[in-house]
Amino acid sequence: MPDSSQVQPAAFNCQGGLVLNRSSFLMEPGQARELENFEPDIQGGYRRISGYSKFINQVVPITSSTAEEPLMSALFANKVLAARGEKIFSSASTELSIRITASTTLSGSGILTVASTSGFSSSGTIQIDSEKFTYTGISTNSFTGVTRATSSTTAALHSKLSVISEDWTVRDTGRTGAKKYHFERFNFDGNEKIILVDQVNAPVVFNSSIAATDVSESSVAGATVVAAYRNHMFYAGKSTIPQEVIFSEPFNEDGFSSGAGAGSVKVDDTVVALKVFRNSLFIFCETRIFKLTGSSLSDFVVEPVTRNIGCINSFTVQEFAGDLIFLGPDGLRTVAATARIGDTELGTISKNIQSIFDENIKDAVEFDSVVIPDKTQYRIFFNKAGQASSISKGATCVLKKEGFEFSELKGLKTTCTDTFVERGDVIVLHGDVTGFVQRQESGSTFDGSTILGKYRSPDMAFGDSGIRKHMQKVIINYRPEGVIDTDLFVRYDNEDKNSARPAVYPFDTTNLPSAYGSALYSTTSSTTQFAYGGGQDPLDRKSVEGSGFSIILRVEDDGVSNPYSLKGFQLEYQLGARR
């Protein structure tokens, strides 16, 4: 039969990200007025972010004061390096390959099967959740001679994929007054190494055996930033020579003889950061940016990129999607090489959320950033003194075909970060104010604390703000990754207090699509029901109430949801009278 209902459909995809610098008349329906703890999804839509969980179960030890925070977390040589106070420590992490019940007996001859034992000592103590184990030997994928519930801990149930980590081992001491670290992984002589600078003490180099050696040259002690370029090590940011960049001899991070190829360059501004990009070393300063090109002392050349724009904080500089991204005084910027060889283009990319940067740049004490390469995503964290983790904020930037899209983060307070790709596995780490090293993109909570996701659409008038729309139905297209428990709100007339405010519409699912061979079996009593052959992007049809001249959709989850993606919406309404 022909449709005589006079219902008007209006469908849109969720795309465009958070937009705070346009009026509702200019915003596209798929853009967002609020997008908190969602991320623009490279597969389309807005995805409620994953959480983070402990990568090392043991807290990084305090060295002298309870006020100490982790100053560094870095992956190197199958170890996690962490700095706190005056010391540098190492640990190792893996995952349990089988489930262990509380009644499983492990009393000196037990075996724990794990993903890998790379980086672990040949014997020692490990921890799963809060239970400690000892072991006397290792093989490629197991700990042997295992005894459980040691050190007065209690045997407990541990699920498959639970994190296993070893106790922290002291690797370097005496780093008096150390501040937040920069580091660089490098290989000058066929051996993998990592160099660390802490803004106060001598740079320190670790080899793959995690043996520490200080750089002996006094002129680079106290360097704040470091970078390997053209087989030289470059040091900068020392408080007594803030405009000088010192570089070592080729292939020798601790050789500084000018006759052997070492030297220095000066710029006319305080150096903030060093970053290699393609064939140049970019020197970010407070109000200027330079780049160094060449291959040796004889032909190194420094030229200005811009004398009007600088970098606010060295920990915001990252290589991202083939560009360099950094925090300037007016928000996020890129340094992008154009088609013309040797030319450089500077672009501001964060105008859509300029108000977020204006609010946080002036108040943040520290900044951190990470790149999640498999999502083409950059995250920046604004860390304010005395602010609780639950209200600490940040932002995401995702590069999509149409351009950059943004969202806001809330509930992550970092003290240091690292991203490392290991055999295709992207590992994103951060240290937090509780003293733990956490792994981002893990789980559905912030280490046990709920994640509150919020989405708000623009005020949608569908081309005519003078016609009343009588809402009939909202159809939600989404992709769940597990059980979700979320609410849909429909509001009218720019959320005017006198407009209709219908009760919330529960938006949840316990029936998940699954493919044979990859899903777990469920029963009629299971909390989650797996439906073979179900669609990955289901439609949830909600009959709704109310009317108004503009319509707003809100989605808010209560913090106990697994991640899910909002793909799009269809609104169905009938036209009413003109105001």
Residue ranges and their predicted role:
Residues 96-110, 115-179:
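Small/polar beta-strand repeat architecture
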Residues 55-64, 168-174, 211-216, 259-264, ...:
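A short beta-strand motif characteristic of beta-propeller blades
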Residues 166-170, 210-214, 253-258, 297-302, ...:
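Beta-strand initiation motifs
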Residues 62-67, 102-109, 116, 209-224, ...:
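Surface-exposed ligand/attachment interfaces on beta-rich extracellular proteins
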Residues 182-217:
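Hydrophobic or amphipathic alpha-helical targeting/insertion segments
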Residues 281-306:
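Surface-exposed extracellular loop regions of Gram-negative outer-membrane beta-barrel proteins
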Residues 221-252:
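Carboxylate/His-rich catalytic cores and anion/metal-binding grooves
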Residues 1-93, 172-192, 308-323, 329-579:
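Beta-sheet repeat architectures centered on beta-propellers
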